[in-house]
A protein has these predicted regions:
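Conserved alpha/beta-domain cores
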Residues: 1-205, 213
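Expand to "…catalyze enediolate/carbanion chemistry for C-C bond making/breaking, isomerization
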Residues: 211-212, 224-230
Length: 230
C-alpha cells in the first residue's frame, strides 16, 4: 500500500535538505507531483498532505480529474505532448504548460487563453531537447532565443522559463554535468535581460543532482504515487 502522505513529507524534507546543502534559499524549489494515470482520490490525498502543484500528461484523463477536483485550489501543469487541435482545452484548464516546442501551437493557446474571461495568462516553460535526441520533443538550443523573441506579442501566455528531460544516466556526476549545462543556458538568457524565473529539470531518479545544479521545479511521480499503471 502506497503511503502518499508519508512520501510527500519525506520528499519535501529531502528538497529542503538539498536546498541547504546547495546554499539555496529555503523553498526555492517547487515540487510538482506527476499524477498521470493516478486517480482523483490519489490526487486529493496528496493535496490534503499539502501538495498543490500537479502535472498531467494525458489530456482527456486530466480534464476529467480537473473537473472532479474543482473544489480544490490545485495548480495544474500540462507536461504531455501538445496536439494543436487540443490547444483550446489546454488553454482553458491549465495554469502551466511545460512542453511547448512549436510557436504556431503556442500562438493558438495564447489566443484562446486571452479570450477566456477571468483567466490570467498561462505560464509557459519552453521544452528544450538538450541532447538532440530524435525520440524526444523540444526545440534545439540554437533556436531557443529566437523562439522566446517570437512570443513577445502573445498576450495570453507568460514565458517563465525552460524545461528539459536529459538523456538517461544513472550516475550523479553525469546527471549533474548535464543539468549544469542547462542551468548555464538559462542563466545566459537571464543575463541578456529575459525575464525568466523557472528552470523545470529533475525527476524521481535525479532530482538531487538537478537541485544542486539550480533547478527551481522538480517533477516527481513514482516516488510519490508508486509505479504508474500500464
Amino acid at each position: 500500500m502506497i503511503d502518499i502522505k508519508k512520501n510527500i513529507i519525506e520528499i519535501k524534507k529531502n528538497i529542503l535538505n538539498l536546498e541547504l546543502r546547495s546554499n539555496r534559499k529555503k523553498n526555492s524549489v517547487t515540487l510538482m507531483a506527476v499524477s498521470k494515470t493516478k486517480t482523483s482520490e490519489d490526487i486529493r490525498e496528496a493535496y490534503e498532505a499539502g501538495q498543490k502543484d500537479f502535472g498531467e500528461n494525458y489530456l482527456q484523463e486530466s480534464i476529467d480529474k480537473i473537473q472532479d477536483l474543482s473544489d480544490l485550489d490545485i495548480i495544474w501543469h500540462y507536461i504531455g505532448k501538445i496536439q494543436s487541435n487540443k490547444s483550446k482545452l489546454i488553454a482553458e484548464n491549465y495554469n502551466w504548460i511545460h512542453s511547448v516546442d512549436k510557436i504556431s501551437t503556442l500562438k493558438k493557446i495564447s489566443d484562446y487563453r486571452k479570450n477566456f474571461k477571468n483567466k490570467n495568462k498561462i505560464n509557459v516553460c519552453i521544452q528544450v531537447n538538450i541532447d538532440n535526441e530524435e525520440t524526444k520533443s523540444g526545440i534545439n538550443l540554437q533556436s531557443l532565443e529566437n523562439f522566446i523573441k517570437e512570443t513577445y506579442d502573445f498576450d495570453g501566455v507568460n514565458i517563465r522559463g525552460i524545461m528539459a528531460i536529459p538523456m538517461y544516466t544513472d550516475t550523479y556526476e553525469s546527471q549533474y554535468k548535464t543539468f549544469i549545462r542547462i542551468k548555464n543556458i538559462f542563466d545566459n538568457l537571464v543575463n541578456k535581460g529575459y525575464k525568466l524565473d523557472t528552470l523545470s529539470i529533475g525527476m524521481s531518479s535525479d532530482y538531487d543532482a538537478a537541485i544542486a545544479a539550480g533547478s527551481t521545479l522538480v517533477r516527481i511521480g513514482t516516488s510519490i504515487f508508486g509505479e504508474r499503471q500500464k
